[in-house]
Every structure is written in C-alpha cells, then in structure tokens.
C-alpha cells in the first residue's frame, strides 16, 4: 500500500506477512497478544486512530506492529485469507490513501472503523474471561519492583550466592547502564 497509510497498516501488514510466509513471526508468538490483552484489561485498548501514534508509554513503538498485525489476523480469520490481496489492491488503487474505511468495505464488506470497534469489544471480553478463569485457579502473585529509574531492566543475573542482582538498565534518556544491586533491588550502583 501507499506510504501515506497509518503505521498500523504498513507495519501490521509487514508483521502479518512475516508470520504468514514463515513458520515463525510475531503473530504466532504471545507478546503481541499480551500487549493487547493488558491494554484491554486496563481500559486502554486503543482506537483505530490511536494505534498509529507514537508514545513514550508502554508499549511504545510496538503498538503499530501489535495492533496492526493482530487486527489483520482478526479480519482474515473472520472474512478469509483471500481478502488480503483485495485489501492491498483497494488501498493501492486509491488516489487518496487515507480512505481506509472505503478499502475495508470493498475488500471485507465492512468499514475498518466499525470492525475495529467490534474487535476491541471482542478483545475486552476475551481478556476479561481469561482473567476470571485465571483468578479462579488461585491468587496470582503480585510483581515486585526490583529496578528504579528504568524503562527496561534487561538480562538480569543473580549471583551464585543469591545476594546480588546485576542487570542492564535503560531509561530512554541516556546510554544503557550495567547496574549491580542487592537481590531485593536495594543499594543500586552503576558499574
């Protein structure tokens, strides 16, 4: 499709095809499902207009890939894989590539805005059902924060005696840092 489409379309298509044409890919993984499930449970499932935007808040740059690829997966599960070629041709054939609802109607028989809203409702319902099912199995452990001033705490390793934790801290403001802390996250120092 044209380069003027929202990022969730271009990146969502690329990510969907990555999975469709290989035995791997992010649509086959669980991370994107988790991103959308978390958003649904927290009341933050993004609208079709929000999914293309950038934000420093989680899931940051992942949103276009996660929302786009799983929305296309939803559309094709519901309306058939053969509709993807029709959608791409419909978008590519437009003088004004922003008319995604028209492309959706001509290829899937529905406007993408309406189908997105239905998909969001379905995602909320499924997430709430899974949440209830898991809660019925017993209490879920609450997470314990071990890092401070970090957007990401990556590659954690615990010392052999269990007293120390070392990890890579990324705060998106400065270079990544190697941090050594007590196993409970206290007394951090940068190495």
Question: Where are the language model's segments positioned?
Answer:
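Acidic/His/Gly-enriched intrinsically disordered linker/tail segments
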Residues: 1-140
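Short, small/polar residue-rich loop motifs at catalytic or cofactor-binding pockets
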Residues: 3, 151-152, 174
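Flexible, glycine-rich phosphate/dinucleotide-binding loops
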Residues: 23, 174, 187
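Multi-bladed beta-propeller domains
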Residues: 126-152, 181-191
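Beta-strand C-termini and the immediately following turn/loop, strongest in propeller blades
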Residues: 147, 159-160, 165-172, 182
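A short loop-to-beta-strand structural motif that recurs across blades of beta-propeller domains
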Residues: 177-179
């Amino acid at each position: 499709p044209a380069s003027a489409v929202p990022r969730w379309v271009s990146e969502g298509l690329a990510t969907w095809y990555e999975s469709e044409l290989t035995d791997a890919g992010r649509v086959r993984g669980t991370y994107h499902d988790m991103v959308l499930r978390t958003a649904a449970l927290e009341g933050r499932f993004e609208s079709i207009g929000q999914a293309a935007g950038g934000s420093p808040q989680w899931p940051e740059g992942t949103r276009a890939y996660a929302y786009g690829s799983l929305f296309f997966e939803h559309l094709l599960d519901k309306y058939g894989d053969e509709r993807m070629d029709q959608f791409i041709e419909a978008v590519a054939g437009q003088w004004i590539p922003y008319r995604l609802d028209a492309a959706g109607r001509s290829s899937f028989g529905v406007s993408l805005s309406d189908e997105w809203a239905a998909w969001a409702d379905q995602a909320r319902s499924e997430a709430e059902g899974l949440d209830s099912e898991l809660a019925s199995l017993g209490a879920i452990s609450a997470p314990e924060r071990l890092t401070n001033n970090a957007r990401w705490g990556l590659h954690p390793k615990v010392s052999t005696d269990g007293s120390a934790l070392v990890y890579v801290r990324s705060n998106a403001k400065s270079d990544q840092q190697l941090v050594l802390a007590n196993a409970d996250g206290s007394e951090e120092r940068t190495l």
